[in-house]
């Protein structure tokens, strides 16, 4: 009986949060964002869990708080979690729930951007490679097969993070429906606007059916709201520096009222191989930040901290002159927090502006320690092509794609042996990656 009394006393002394998190409310109403009934602007920074080792997540969140921000936004990368069909991975660097929990512990609200298409200069825009092997599949449209798999993805995502919505006591306050869909609508004029809207509505409904119940929003260029906006979701503008134009276009698609938000406030820009790295100055970024603050415009720095495209995750852009523009392994983005996690001149400039509008900004945390790596001497080499004879070939008259070979990432060796001398020009049409060509062993 005494043991039972001790147990009851122990239970009584435990904080309530040990068993149940306190629910909160986040609403979009009367032209404002409201957190627990109080008008609350959003000062957010984009940071992707997949581009930062999990050991550094907390430090980066602390850097954001010390910059004056109150929220973090992140995409969810479907192909980061389901690299093989039906095999899900949410461990280690892929532990999205842990990422969100740590953000909440550090006093940040969380904005979730699950796509399913995310762009983000990420491989296949976040789609798993194996989707292309499914018969009848047409991605990013009102297609039965595609929607079958997006439903499975969204339901699995909810299983991981649904309990972390503010309505359940977590830090997630908003969720984005699709991603910059207006750009896709503008490019795919072969598909009717009605069909585009039907697809967009079904993605939103899948999010609702899965159990996501926090406010929804869309993000597009301000000139693309016609194709990208969807009913009962706040339209936000990407890269819009003209505040009058921002308010005009949001009013048009949101019952003539705000709140007004720039969901992608570009702090820098992406970098392509063999091109100069884009640079923007700190002073102009700080000035635009203050313009938003003075005019009650919420914002999300894209990116506040870019990180790294590990492995084969970096994507590419398309350009008519150069066909393909592959992105770098580095996703530094010339952002306020460098790829290494250090404060930059942009960071300091923005922090000084934010101090005028945000009370009690904490001190900037110390930089993470670095290590010295001694010189590494390589004394052995191996000819990769020399081992090709040990691999059983797949024969055919025409080369197969990676997907047809059931290979999501890495390298494929395509070879052709000619029995007689030939001459002419080698043309490779439709190449979607980097190719290294050898003729008789010569590069």
Region spans (language model):
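Aromatic-lined substrate-binding rim segments of carbohydrate-active enzymes
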Residues: 57-125, 129-130, 204-209
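N-terminal carbohydrate-binding accessory modules
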Residues: 19-71, 101
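Conserved residues at the C-terminal ends of beta-strands
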Residues: 46-48, 75, 178, 305
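Aromatic- and acidic-residue-enriched carbohydrate-binding clefts of CAZyme catalytic domains
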Residues: 38, 75-87, 92, 120-145, ...
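Glycine-rich, histidine-containing beta strand-loop boundary motifs that form or position
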Residues: 75-76, 112-116, 218-220, 301-306, ...
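Bacterial Sec-dependent N-terminal signal peptides
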Residues: 1-22
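Substrate-binding/catalytic cleft of secreted carbohydrate-active enzymes
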Residues: 112, 116-149, 155-300
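Carbohydrate-binding surfaces of carbohydrate-active enzymes
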Residues: 147-161, 168-177, 182-183, 187-190, ...
């Amino acid at each position: 009986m005494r043991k039972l009394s001790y147990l009851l006393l122990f239970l009584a002394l435990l904080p309530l949060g040990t068993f149940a998190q306190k629910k909160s409310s986040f609403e979009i109403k009367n032209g404002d964002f409201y957190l627990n009934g109080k008008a609350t602007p959003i000062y957010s920074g984009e940071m992707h869990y997949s581009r930062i080792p999990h050991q550094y997540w907390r430090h980066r969140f602390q850097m954001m708080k010390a910059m004056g921000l109150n929220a973090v936004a992140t995409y969810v990368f479907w192909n980061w979690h389901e690299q093989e069909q039906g095999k899900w991975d949410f461990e280690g660097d892929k532990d999205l729930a842990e990422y969100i929990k740590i953000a909440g512990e550090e006093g940040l609200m969380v904005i979730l951007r699950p796509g399913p298409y995310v762009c983000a200069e990420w491989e296949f825009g976040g789609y798993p490679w194996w989707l292309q092997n499914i018969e009848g599949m047409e991605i990013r449209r009102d297609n039965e097969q595609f929607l079958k798999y997006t439903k499975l993805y969204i339901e699995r995502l909810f299983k991981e993070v649904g309990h972390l919505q503010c309505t359940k006591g977590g830090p997630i306050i908003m969720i984005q429906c699709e991603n910059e869909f207006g750009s896709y609508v503008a490019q795919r004029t072969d598909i009717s606007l009605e069909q585009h809207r039907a697809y967009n509505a079904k993605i939103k409904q899948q999010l609702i059916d899965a159990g996501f119940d926090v406010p929804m929003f869309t993000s597009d260029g301000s000139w693309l709201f016609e194709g990208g906006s969807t009913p009962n979701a706040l339209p936000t503008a990407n890269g819009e520096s003209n505040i009058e134009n921002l308010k005009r276009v949001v009013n048009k698609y949101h019952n003539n009222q705000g709140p007004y938000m720039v969901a992608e406030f570009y702090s820098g820009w992406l970098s392509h191989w063999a091109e100069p790295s884009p640079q923007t100055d700190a002073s102009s970024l700080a000035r635009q930040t203050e313009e938003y603050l003075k005019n009650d415009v919420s914002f999300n720095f894209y990116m506040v901290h870019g990180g790294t495209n590990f492995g084969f995750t970096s994507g590419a852009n398309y350009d008519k002159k150069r066909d393909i523009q592959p992105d770098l392994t580095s996703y530094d983005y010339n952002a306020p927090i460098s790829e290494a996690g250090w404060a930059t001149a942009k960071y300091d400039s923005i922090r000084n502006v934010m101090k005028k509008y945000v009370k009690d900004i904490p001190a900037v945390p110390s930089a993470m320690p670095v290590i010295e790596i001694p010189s590494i001497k390589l004394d052995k080499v191996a000819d990769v092509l020399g081992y090709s004879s040990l691999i059983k070939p797949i024969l055919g008259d025409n080369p197969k794609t990676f997907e047809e070979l059931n290979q999501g990432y890495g390298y494929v060796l395509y070879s052709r042996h000619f029995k007689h001398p030939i001459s002419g020009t080698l043309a490779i049409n439709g190449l979607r990656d980097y190719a290294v060509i050898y003729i008789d062993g010569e590069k």
